[in-house]
Amino acid sequence: MNLLGRVRTLLKNPITIWVYWLVQKVFLEYNFRDKNLKIGYLVNISNCQFGQFNTLYNGASLTNVALGDFTYIGNNSVLMNTTVGKFVCIGPEVLCGLGKHPSRNFVSIHPIFFSKLGQAQITFASAADFEEYDTIEIGNDVWIGARAIIRDGVKIGDGVIIGAGAVVTKDVPAYAVVGGVPARILRYRFESAEIEFLEHIKWWDKDVRWLRENHELFHDIKDLQKIMKVPNKSDSSDENHKKNH
């Protein structure tokens, strides 16, 4: 066995993998100690940004990911090139941003003809001739069920629920509940006026003290609406009219 083969064998050794995870865990949790980052067993992290109180459960893998406050990632989920908002719940074995293959015009879907990443060990391409990855944007207060798959380039609005096993291939509007393969809108969580209210107040940007003191109001949207008045469109129009005269 040559030197390169021995190195590859060493890197695949369970003890080496465990040591690498432990060193990374200690390093990141110390560096982000002011953010209370919690890293589970054998979590893999590369080029990520964290908010407050993020939790990464066992076996999760994150590459080029940014997480908002209080967002957690379930067991064995894989996220790449993804921006995630605040208060997002991602279940186990969710797949986000695993890359694309061409399905039009290109004679072959194989990356050996268009990619320089070497997925098949060698490549015929002298340049990256196809955009293999595109950023996924996930809003705030989103729940993604177990084993859901989200395609590259998709934008998920605030308040969305994605059912377990769904395959999301296109953008999802705020507060929609989607499911199926491919995912389709099943219903909305709230009435249109209530959605407009939530998008206006952006409660996820409130400070933690306010959220803690008012957490019981989150049990019923009508209770929250009673204490947080939002001017309707006619009121805003009247106010603008007065300013202009």
List the predicted regions and their residue ranges.
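Glycine-centered loop/turn positions within well-structured domains
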Residues: 166, 170, 174-176, 184
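Domain-scale signature associated with acetyltransferase and cell-envelope carbohydrate enzymes
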Residues: 1-141, 148, 183, 192-245
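Conserved catalytic-core motifs of eukaryotic protein kinase domains, centered on the activation segment
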Residues: 100-101, 172, 188-189
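Beta-rich strand-turn-strand
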Residues: 150-157, 166-169
